Amino acid sequence: MASLEAHYSARDIDARILAALRAVGLNPDKRLSPEELGALDHFHTGGLRASLELLELAQIRAEHRVLDIGAGLAGPARMLASKLGCRVDCIELSPDYCAGAALLNRLTGLEDRIAVHRGSALEMPFADDSFDAAGMQNVGMNIADKRQLYAEIRRVLKPGGRFAFQEMAAGKTPTTHFPLPWATDPSDSHLVSADEMRSVLGECGFTTECLEDTSEEHLNRTGANATPSAPGQLGLAVFVDNLGQKAGNARRSLEDGQVRLVRGVFLKN
């Protein structure tokens, strides 16, 4: 756990974010739109595009109460609150990311629709049957106990609630290219195959609506020469150290078949 907390540490994140906003000509003293922050606050494979595609699959409506699991800087939560007007609760383990999320919620004027909670996805501070939908992007790779994770998500969903996710799944061979965006070394990378995800979710009381492998689609879209933003620009490098190396290793892992990118929607029985 200590190594995982260090991996997701982003000291002085508020100052970093404010400096990056000003560097690209955005005024943090005026209300910003979630769209202006899209390159910064979607810390998962595919970024904002992946969030929009998952939103379409999830079929979330304005009246829904939504849970964002492992929310990071809460970019998807702001997207939901802004586009649909729904209420979103975020659960995030990193105190630095919680601070950054709260700052960006204030800067976009969405703090009344989004609540940020620091805590673990394995023991969430919510009552049973609280949410109409839950979303999770590139989070389960850090959690070894998938059964407890899925059981806890099911607990907080209402009957018939929808769980939409994007994750890296295990490929045909072990992962060898480190550091990765989700783990500095193998001790914090807990990948399982897409088939095992489906099986454990079923055992935990979920029904499959869809589960698809989007690895090749992602590789074709991004291109081998795609480069992350540099420090001082508005992008993930504002708060993710060694982003170029981590992103490059993630691409190599996909190309080598060591990991697969999957997304799915499951319904609570």
Regions found by a protein language model. Give the residues of each.
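Short, glycine-/aromatic-enriched active-site segment of Class I SAM-dependent methyltransferases
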Residues: M168-D188
